[in-house]
């Protein structure tokens, strides 16, 4: 049996109205949180939320979490960085409990596309995924993590994308007594958009007494393929989720997303492995492919986005103006301009200009 599901995910809410000042952002963030909790029925379903400063999503300063619950759910914001929005983080266990309790309370099931549809019924904010973990479970299918890893490490099997290109993600594993129970395709990191973890789910649940321990005992074999998608890839999936109406469409999207990046082939015959073919057989139709980034991304546009959203320049200028007024701000900008005029570009900058100047001259300004 193969089962497809969303494991964990993170949403970010962005206000549709910019606050007048940084001082008004906290009040606005709480308004967004209140609207989310109302539309999601989160406190009715998961339990009372209380102020929390522990275990907030990384980078956020203030937030709420479920009181006295074994699962991790958090709503958070940063008082000084409006562009970070309001972060909604469901752990896998919290999402499982939310779905269970929601169905008991409202006598109808709920999936991620329905949750997003419910919380988007507002003019206060927009929502978008910043992370989503997609899991495909092989239950009693008699496949071995150790065997797959050994075949990959010996180059007897390779990984390709749906377009037929080799997936060159690095391979690593957790091995004990010559037995591999978990391996990764890709590396963990802040700017990594995709990572695949393949692991023995039964072993994980029974050894840690996890939330699905009793279920794991019922199976003789349980292997999970779990893909983590972040950043632009998560945004692509988020956009697709908003057009979904049926559970079968959700299944097609989740399987399409995972197999768009990860398909396993026998090297010599160039044919799909049996387990990868089983995954593709879940599809009624291929519904989704990750959009290819423009070749000019990671160039001027990314630098510009970093300056606008991540560099701290605007908070710095705001503080200058708040302390010394418009006169101080003008003097600060003049100081920065003088420093820029004294700047000497290094070799990397000159090589970049040699490579891309003609393209940008023809294309026009990125700051329109």
Label each PLM-derived region with a short phrase.
Residues 1-297, 306, 310-368:
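Structured, helix-rich domain cores that form ligand/interaction pockets
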Residues 300-302:
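Helix-turn-helix DNA-binding segment
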